[in-house]
Amino acid sequence: LTLMLEQHAAKTHLRDLNVIESPAQQLRAAYDLMPTDTAEDWSIISRRMSALPAAIDGYIETLREGMRQQIVPARRQVVEVITQIARYSDKGGFFAVFAAEAAPAEGELPATLARELHDNANAARVAYDTLAEFLRSELAPVASEQDGGGREQYARASRGFLGATSDLGETYEWRLRER
């Protein structure tokens, strides 16, 4: 909780975009571990996909607020995330294939559910295209040329990833010795 409060105070959510672990990936990755054995599982997936456009709209608005406050991610990260998004939103990308190959462990999906899933997957693709266009036309032009965010930001990110505080200097020195 302390870390979350520190991150909020540092406004890291206003520039939360990178190529590894940010909402751009998390919103898509949420489907990776969802159960797919039954028609009910696929119905839940479809409902969650129907909410994806609103989630992406909210994410875009958060990044816009960062732009207003001049708290922006690195341009290199923005450009690479645009490339990642193409793999999600392409007609042969994640959402299209996921919906096209949807099937319970036994039998077939009801036709109405298959259509709903297809429609919601298409809406998710369009939402990701909207995100890519925002990144390309609005965020990339004002994004930072500087990678990273300095020692304090790195220390917070490290604590979040590890779940513990580490001595960054000691860790760096250890890495040099291990070469």
Question: Model-found features: residue ranges?
Answer:
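N-terminal maturation segment of proteins
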Residues: 1-179
